[in-house]
Amino acid sequence: MKMNNKKVKPSDSAGIVFKIFLLFLSSVLFWLSNPNIFFEDGLGCLAFLNYLPILFLIKKSRFIEAVFFGAVYGGLSYGLYGYWLNAFHPLGLIIVCIGYFVICALLFSVLKWADIITSKNGWLLQFIIICGYEYLKTLGFFGMNYGVTAYTQWKNLYLIQICSLGGVFALNYIVIFPSVFLFSLISKKKEKYRLLNNVDNGKKSSISAYVKKEKALSDTSLKLTFICGGLWLAIFAASYIYGLSVMGKNNSDRYVTVAAIQNNESPWKNGIEEYSRNVNKLIQLTEEAQSLSSEIDFVVWPETAVAPSIIYNYDYGTDMRRFLLISQLLNFIDENNAVFVIGNSHEEELKNTGRTRYNSALVFESGKNVHPPEPGIYSKIKLVPFTESFPWKHTFPYFYQKLLNGDIHMWEKGDVYKVFDYRGLKFSTPICFEDTFSTVCRRMVLNGSRCFINLSNDSWSKSNACQKQHLAMAVFRSVENGVPSVRSTASGVTCVINPNGKVIKAAPEFCEAYIIGRVPVIDDGQQTLYTRIGDIAGIVAAGLSALILIIQTIVVIITKYENRFYR
C-alpha cells in the first residue's frame, strides 16, 4: 500500500490562511456595520465594503470550498449579529445560525457558479444576485429583514430618502455596488498584469503574442466597470440632492399629541400579582405624562402590556382577581380624555376550537367602547417563526413540543390589516417585528393608514444592539411610506419618528420612562411612489439574476457540447 507523502506547498498554506482571513473579515464587516455591542448605532460606512472580501473569497475558492465558506460565513455572521437571541433561548440562536448556514451556502454556490460561467464581467451578475438574495431572504416562513445591507444607513437621513421612491431594496443597489466595483477594479488589474506577463515571457511568434496581448486587454477591460461606476456616482449624488430637497418640507400643518409609555418589564414574569403591579405602574406613568401636558390625545402602551385578556376576563372570566384588575383598568380609561392603544393577550371563545389567543392591539376611547369593553382590535398577522408560530406542529409534533417546553407563546394569526380612525388620525398598529417588514406596513398604508403606532417588547434580549437593530428598520417604514411612527416598547427604543425617518424624541433604554411628542396628521391624498409600486427593486433583482443565470448556463452547456462535437 502506497503512502501519500505529498507535502503541502507554502503557497497553498498561505492561500488557505488568506481565505480564512477573508472569511472572518467579511463576517466582522457585516457585524460591525449593523448596531452591535461596541457601536450601538453601527458603523454604516463599513457596509459599502461588506461584500468585497466575499467576492475575493469566492474568486479564490473552488466550488466546494465556496459552498463550505458560505456555510461558515452564514453561521458566524448571524451568530455575531443576533447573539442576543441566546437570551431568549439558545435554541433560537441555533435555529437562526443553522438557517443562514444553509442559506449562505446556497448564496456562495450561486455566486461561484456565476463566476464560472462568465468570462469577462461576472462581477455584474454577482451584483444582481446579491441584491436578489437580500430580497429573497425576507420572504416565506423563515424570512426576516434583519441583516439587509441598506438598514445600516438608518442614520444617513439624506441618503435614505430615496426609499420613498423605491424602498429599502432600491437603496441596497447603492450600498452594495461599491463592493463589486472595487472587486472588479482590483481583480481585473491583477488579471491584466498576470496575462500580459505570461505573454511577454512566453516563446511565441510576434503575431501570436500580439493576438494574445489583445485578448488579454479585451478580457480585462475596465470600460464597463468605469461606466457603471460613473452611473453609480451620479445616482448617489442624485439621491443626496433628492434627500436635501425633501428633508426641509413640512409634511402637515395638523398634529396630534401622543404619550408613549415604556414600563421596562420582563415578559417572563407571570401571575396575578405581577400583572397587577405592572398595570398599576403603567397607570402611574400615564398619569405622570398627563400631568405634564393636558393636550395628550393618545396614550400608547407596549406589546402585551396587559397580560390577562381584557375582553375575555370581563365577559367570561371566573378569576375574581383578574376581573377586578380589568375593571380597575377600564375605569381608569373611561375617566380619561385620551384614546388608549394597549397591547393585550387577547382571547376569543370559539365553539369548535375553544379558546383562541392573539397578540393584539386594543383601542379604547372614553364614553364610546370602554364599558362594556368593545375596543377596536388588530391582531398580529406576521408572527415570529418558531417562537410565535409553527405551522408544522402535526408533522413534527416532537419538535413542536420542544418549542413549547421553551416557555414560548404560540399565537393565532390575525387576518385583517386594520386601520383605526380616531381624532382625525388614521393609524395602524404593527406589533413587534411587523414593522421590520416593508410589505406589512405598505399594506396598511394602502388600506388607508397614515401613521404607524408600533407596540413592541424586546426587553427579553437584554441588549441595546437588538433594540437599535429593530429601530433601524422601523425608521425605513416611515421613509418608504411618508408617514410618522410612534413606538411604545417595554424597554426600548420608545420614540417618535417623523415621515423623513428622523427620531425626534426617544426615551432612554431599559428604564421606566415615557415620551410626549407631536405627530403630524398626513392627508389621505399623500402617497409615495414606493407605496404604489412596492418592492419592485428587489423583485427585479431576483428575477433578473435567475433569468441571466439560466440563459448563461444554457449558453455554456451548448458551447461546451459544440466544442466536443467539432473537435
List PLM regions with ranges.
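Short, conserved active-site loops that position catalytic residues or coordinate cofactors/metal ions
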Residues: F38-P53, Q262-N263, E295-D315, S449, ...
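Active-site catalytic loop in hydrolytic enzyme cores
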Residues: L85-L91, L136-V168, G354-S438
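Short, solvent-exposed loop/turn segments at secondary-structure junctions
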Residues: A87, P308-S309, E349-L350, W460-S463
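Soluble catalytic regions of membrane-associated enzymes that act on cell-envelope
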Residues: Y242-P385, F420-R423, T429, F433
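CN hydrolase (nitrilase-like) catalytic-core segments centered on the catalytic cysteine
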Residues: F127-I128, V306, T318-V341, T395, ...
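Short beta-strand scaffold segments in enzyme catalytic cores
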Residues: N359-V363, K418, G492-I497, I515-G517
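Membrane-embedded alpha-helical bundles of multi-pass enzymes
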Residues: K2-V246, S463, A474, T489, ...
